[in-house]
């Protein structure tokens, strides 16, 4: 049975006047785990132990999520992609992640991490990604029931579904985990969104930003931009595919993601929140991937003096 206890100790940093929460354990080259909607660093609790001893382990809570502060006076224009990006990237800057960063990305953490990597190409040692927002999507890329849910969330009904009824936590989250989440686990996931109304706004803004049928255009542009780079970048990549998956289950999406160069693929059981069903396999795969990167770094360092002496 997967463990329900959080990993590590939450720390806090003030970013743009708001307190943001994060885990920051050990030292060395940073391995940065980034969640999406509606989760938090708690999602990685059973994955992180497998990477102990491999470097500095960092997992941040997005603004308004997990243990991070809520925004003041939020409304329909709050917690969208670019605002989230501003807060997260400022936190990463404040944490001084270094120049050999391995990114481990899920859901909207994927779009954010790919975006950061595209902007800091010379600082990225490797990228691990799973069930990420990574490609502009069409409605038929989703299973019918998921498409119907997103249509509701993106309609005027979305406020009632999420702000009043907490649909993403009480309905969506448990429905796309293969096992049944324990009550203790659900308590952790519910905690940031116990209060009805604007405290739940992040879990509504995110699905309204999913790049569907060309909208919202400003998010599609970001994803197209980093997608062009990923299609040609030789940075080492590990694609952890969920079987059957949700947002990367259709062949069109898989074909695009699989075309990225210098990439290894493994498959684990899971729908969307695969960390809740296959944490051990995911953690072991990440650890193996990081060890391979480290071995390549060592070979490069050993070869450099020989090249210099030969010249």
Swiss-Prot record:
Signal peptide: none annotated. The lineage of its organism: Bacteria, Bacillati, Actinomycetota, Actinomycetes, Mycobacteriales. It catalyses: 1-haloalkane + H2O = a halide anion + a primary alcohol + H(+). Its EC number is 3.8.1.5. Catalyzes hydrolytic cleavage of carbon-halogen bonds in halogenated aliphatic compounds, leading to the formation of the corresponding primary alcohols, halide ions and protons. It is an enzyme of class 3 (hydrolase). This is Haloalkane dehalogenase. Monomer. Residues 30-148 form the AB hydrolase-1 domain. Keywords: Hydrolase. GO terms for cellular component: membrane. Belongs to the haloalkane dehalogenase family. Type 2 subfamily. Pfam families: Abhydrolase_1. The active site is at residues 107, 131, 272. It comes from the Bacteria. InterPro entries: AB_hydrolase_1, AB_hydrolase_fold, AB_hydrolase_sf, Haloalkane_dehalogenase_2.
């Amino acid at each position: 049975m997967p463990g329900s206890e959080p990993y590590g100790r939450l720390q806090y940093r003030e970013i743009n006047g708001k307190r943001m929460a994060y885990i920051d354990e050990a030292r060395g080259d940073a391995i940065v785990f980034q969640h999406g909607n509606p989760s938090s660093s708690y999602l990685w609790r059973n994955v992180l132990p497998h990477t102990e001893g491999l470097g500095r382990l960092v997992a941040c809570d997005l603004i308004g999520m997990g243990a991070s502060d809520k925004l003041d006076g939020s409304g329909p224009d709050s917690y969208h992609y670019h605002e989230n990006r501003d807060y997260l990237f400022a936190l990463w800057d404040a944490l001084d992640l270094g120049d050999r960063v391995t990114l481990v990305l899920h859901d909207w953490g994927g779009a954010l991490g790919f975006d950061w990597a595209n902007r800091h190409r010379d600082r990225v040692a490797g990228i691990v990604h799973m069930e990420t927002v990574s490609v502009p999507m069409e409605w038929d890329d989703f299973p019918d029931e998921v498409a119907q849910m997103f249509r509701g969330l993106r309609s005027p009904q979305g406020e009632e579904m999420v702000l009043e009824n907490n649909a993403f936590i009480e309905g969506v989250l448990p429905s796309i985990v293969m096992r049944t989440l324990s009550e203790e686990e659900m308590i952790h996931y519910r905690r940031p969104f116990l209060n009805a109304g604007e405290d739940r706004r992040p879990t509504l803004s995110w699905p309204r930003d999913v790049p569907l049928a060309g909208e919202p255009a400003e998010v599609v542009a970001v994803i197209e931009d980093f997608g062009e780079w990923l299609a040609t970048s030789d940075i080492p990549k590990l694609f952890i595919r969920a079987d059957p998956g949700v947002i990367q289950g259709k062949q069109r999406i898989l074909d695009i993601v699989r075309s990225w160069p210098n990439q290894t693929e493994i498959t684990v059981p899971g729908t969307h929140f695969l960390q809740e069903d296959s944490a051990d396999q995911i953690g072991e795969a990440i650890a193996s991937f990081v060890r391979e990167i480290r071995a390549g770094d060592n070979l490069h360092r050993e070869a450099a003096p020989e090249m210099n002496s030969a010249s």
